């Protein structure tokens, strides 16, 4: 019988296990057991891109510059401050903030110490934000000073929160009904002599909530391992193709699925980071891109529409920007052609979701596809693209069987991979079906492996890259005493891609008007959720089981033109 080797100094249990494997069992590799941790990304950047700049447009109005070396030092100071406040491993710490250097420090300081960085979308309705903070049981919440009134409104509803930390210095600390802690005071009290703890890579590092399109928002809990692997995948040549030669400006907010992973992927590659803060209008973005010689950006179509409109009116061009990722909602082909033909910027069409960390596919051609006629290339690039390494996808029919990749068959899109959700945070049942995550999207996949989203299995509306719940819109309408029945559907919009149209059956004898009904929404949903228009009808189409036939409604109002005055995020 083979002897069992006893532990000796410096030997880990994993190594002993490898040494003690007997014949007939798998032979494990003998490589270092080093966990994949988010802190390793900022440490790598601080050592190997130490003098590379991080430039931020601050909420206070000025431009802030420092280096990756500075960022890691301050992130460590923040970790020390949080420990002094009593934050422990696994505690959730929220952020209500724009893209800026302090928010980046929170990403690494919170996750690096073993707590969970919970990014919160400030565009949600205050009651939703309060629900999310309470569901996550956040111990502390960081916030940009322009969100002080929002914090004052929700703080009494959030009993778990021990303190609200204003991300500013003492000179700009806002006053309000809530006693605020000062970010800079906390950080400056620490010396930064701190070693990142060696955590389990499966430990949670981040938390994002979905937009609650089918009820209350759901939490998606990312691990250190999933986050680092996603960063590796995002940086690949056939994904975002990031390098130390790039200056990257993420327009997509850091509260929106971790800015599509860029705050992790850019330090991994050592590129320059340019963070735009709250000013996302076309003029502000263009001037910042030009001043900082930005080469790469990422955002939703709505933002790019504003930028292109400004550039046309001002008669200006890009001098350094050469590519941008567009996702969140489908990129209009005309926008893709404008970027490439008029401004020489390559558009990378992408698809993903919160449950995917978020990247799933990106439209990048291989060599053979690049040799096809230009029109054929563009038809591929207008789709949502191919999966990046690490993600697997399939489409299935109503019977659950996998459908062919022929560009014709369409079914429910399902995905799996090391950065795909397994369970929702504090959820009971797993959402997986046979080991796959059902996305709720209906799609086709062509023989080249390019995904195209053709419809949504759930009647949600995506406006400017943000989800709007049709169910919530309908519930408010039905609560009006003059409404007998209501349905909310998506209508095409030239700026926001989609906006809600409310179709209403009035109660007999009710004196109901468009304006009175829309006014009824004030204070009940976020302003940008309020429908753009109301159409009154005698009846709504139903199935034999009494369900609304929204597909028929969408067909009826397919060519409906919404008013030009819209309320959007």
Segments the model singles out, each with a brief description of its role:
Residues 54-100, 104-108, 125-130, 182-185:
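Conserved AMP-binding/adenylate-forming core of the ANL superfamily
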Residues 228-247, 255-295, 310-311, 361:
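Conserved AMP-binding/adenylation subdomain of ANL enzymes
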Residues 82-87, 190-202, 207-249, 261, ...:
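Conserved adenylate-forming
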Residues 268, 291-299, 308-379, 392, ...:
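Gly/Ser/Thr-rich phosphate-binding loop
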Residues 124, 130, 141-143, 297, ...:
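AMP-binding/adenylate-forming catalytic core of the ANL superfamily
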Residues 386-414, 447-448, 510-514, 549:
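Conserved beta-loop-beta connector loops within the AMP-binding
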Residues 41-67, 172-174:
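AMP-dependent adenylate-forming
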Residues 84-85, 112-188, 508-510:
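Structural core segment of the AMP-binding/adenylate-forming
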């Amino acid at each position: 019988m083979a002897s069992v080797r006893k532990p000796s100094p410096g030997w880990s249990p994993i190594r002993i296990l490898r040494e003690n494997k007997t014949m007939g069992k798998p032979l494990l590799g003998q490589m270092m057991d080093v966990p994949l941790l988010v802190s390793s990304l900022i440490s790598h950047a601080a050592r190997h891109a130490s003098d590379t700049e991080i430039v931020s447009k601050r909420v206070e109005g000025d431009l802030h510059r420092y280096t990756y070396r500075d960022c890691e030092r301050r992130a460590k100071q923040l970790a020390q401050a949080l420990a002094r406040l009593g934050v422990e491993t696994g505690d959730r710490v929220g952020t209500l903030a724009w893209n800026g250097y302090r928010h980046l420090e929170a990403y690494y300081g919170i996750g690096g110490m073993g707590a969970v960085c919970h990014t919160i979308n400030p565009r949600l309705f205050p009651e939703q934000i309060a629900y999310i903070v309470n569901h996550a049981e956040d111990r502390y919440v960081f916030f940009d000073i322009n969100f002080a009134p929002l914090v004052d409104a929700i703080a009494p509803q959030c009993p778990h929160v021990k303190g609200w930390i204003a991300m500013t210095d003492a000179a700009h600390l806002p006053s309000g009904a809530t006693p605020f802690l000062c970010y800079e005071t906390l950080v400056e009290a620490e010396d930064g002599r701190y070693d990142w703890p060696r955590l389990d890579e499966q430990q949670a590092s981040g938390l994002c909530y979905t937009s609650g399109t089918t009820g209350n928002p759901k939490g998606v809990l990312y691990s250190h391992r999933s986050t680092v692997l996603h960063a590796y995948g995002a940086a690949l040549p056939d994904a975002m193709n990031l390098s130390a030669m790039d200056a990257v400006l993420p327009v997509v907010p850091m509260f929106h699925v971790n800015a599509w992973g860029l705050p992790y992927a850019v330090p991994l590659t050592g590129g320059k980071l340019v963070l735009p803060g709250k000013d996302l209008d076309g003029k502000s973005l263009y001037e910042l891109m030009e001043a900082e010689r930005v080469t790469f950006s990422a955002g939703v179509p709505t933002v790019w529409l504003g930028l292109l409109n400004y550039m046309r009116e001002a008669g200006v061009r890009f001098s350094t920007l050469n590519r941008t990722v567009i996702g969140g909602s489908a990129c209009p082909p005309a926008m893709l052609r404008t970027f490439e033909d008029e401004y020489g910027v390559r558009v990378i069409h992408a698809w993903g979701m919160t449950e995917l960390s978020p990247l799933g596919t990106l439209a990048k051609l291989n060599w053979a596809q690049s040799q096809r006629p230009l029109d054929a290339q563009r038809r591929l690039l207008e789709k949502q693209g191919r999966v990046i390494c690490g993600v697997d996808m399939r489409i299935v029919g109503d019977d659950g069987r996998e459908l062919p990749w022929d560009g014709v068959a369409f079914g429910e899109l399902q995905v799996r991979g090391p950065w795909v959700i397994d369970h929702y945070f504090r959820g009971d049942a797993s959402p997986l079906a046979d080991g796959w995550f059902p996305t709720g999207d209906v799609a086709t996949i062509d023989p080249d492996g390019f995904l195209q989203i053709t419809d949504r299995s759930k009647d949600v509306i995506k406006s400017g890259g943000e989800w709007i719940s049709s169910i919530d819109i309908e519930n408010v309408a039905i609560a009006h005493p003059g409404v007998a029945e209501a349905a909310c559907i998506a209508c095409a919009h030239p700026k926001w891609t989609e906006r809600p149209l409310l179709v209403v059956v009035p109660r007999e004898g009710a004196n109901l008007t468009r304006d009175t009904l829309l006014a009824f929404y004030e204070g009940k949903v976020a302003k940008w959720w309020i429908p753009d228009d109301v159409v009154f009808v005698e009846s709504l189409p139903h199935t034999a089981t009494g369900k609304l036939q929204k597909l028929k409604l969408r067909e009826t109002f397919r060519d409906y033109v919404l008013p030009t005055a819209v309320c959007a995020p």
